[in-house]
Amino acid sequence: MSALDVSVVVPTYNRRAVLARVLDALEHQTLDADRFEVIVVSDGSTDGTDQLLARWATSPRRQAITQANAGPGAARNAGAAAAAGSLLVFVDDDVVPSPDLLVHHLAAHRRAGRSVAGFGPMLKPVDVRQSPWVRWEHATLEKSYDALVSGRWDPSPRLFYSGNASVPASAFAAVGGFDVTRRRAEDTELAYRLADAGLGFTYVHDAVGWHHAERSLASWLAIASAYGGHDVEVVRAGQPWLFDAIIEEYPTRNPVTRAVTQVTVGRSRAVHLTSMALVSLGRLIDRAGGERIARGAFSIVHNIRYYHGVAEALGGRRVFLDTFVPGGRR
C-alpha cells in the first residue's frame, strides 16, 4: 500500500452532536496518525455541522467538504474523489468507531490475499436507549453477525453496509463508486457491482462501530418498503440470482409472517393498518418489559412492508402471489 494507507470517508447530514463523537473517536485510533486521513462531506447540513467542520479541519489529514444536498452516495463519492489512501474506509456519521477499527480493516485486506470488500459490525451502544424498532434492527444485525462468525453464513454483497465498510480505492473507482440516483440501499447495490468485478467479501469482526442510530417510525416503515422495491430493481439491473434468493427465503419466514403477508400484500391500506396495529402492540409489550417478545411484532411489520415493496415493484398483488405462494392463493 502507499505511504498513506487509509482514507476514512464520513458523509454527514444534520447530525452535528454525534458527528463530534465520531470525529473524536477517529482522533484516538491505534493506527499511526501519519498512515490515515479523515475526509468529512457535509451533504447540505443546516444544523451547524459546517461550522464544526471548519474548526475541526486544521491539518492536511483532516479534510472538510461541503456540498448541496445530493444524498449519501454522492457525499461518499465526493470524499473518495478527494482521498489519497489506498484503502477507503466508510464510516457513517452516527457510527462511533472503536479504537482499533482502522487497524482491523487494514489487516483484513492484507490477510485476504485477493481484492476484497470488508464490512464490520455496527453494534448497539450500551449507554443509549433507542426506539423499539431501532433495537429490533440491532438485534437482527447481531443475529447475522453471529451467523457469520459461526460459519453458517458466508460474507456476501447482501450484508455489505457502508456504515462500517472498506474497499480498495482502485476497485471503488473501477466500478464507478456509488450510484448517486439511489437514496436507499446504495451500499448493497455497489457491493453487487464489486462482486461482478471479481471482489470477494470479508467480515471484519473486530472492527466494531457503535451505531447511535435513531429514526422516526415513519422513516423506519418507509425504509422497509423501499428495500423491497430496491431488490427488484437490482434483479432487473442484472442480478437474477437475487430474485431466486428472495423466493427461496420466503417459505422460511415465520408462518404468522407469511399468513399476514398473504392477506395484506399489494393492498396499501391493509399494509398500513396492520403495520400500525402491530407497532402499537409491540410498543405496549416493550413498555411492559417484554422486549424480546416485542421484536416479533416489529419483525412482522418489517417483513410485510418489505414484501409489499417487492409486490409493488413486480406489478401488484396477483403477480406476487403467483410467484411466491403455491397455488397463487389470493
What are the residue ranges of the model-derived segments?
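A conserved acidic beta->alpha catalytic loop
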Residues: 25, 42-51, 69, 92-96
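Conserved donor NDP-sugar-binding/catalytic core segment of glycosyltransferases
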Residues: 100-134, 212
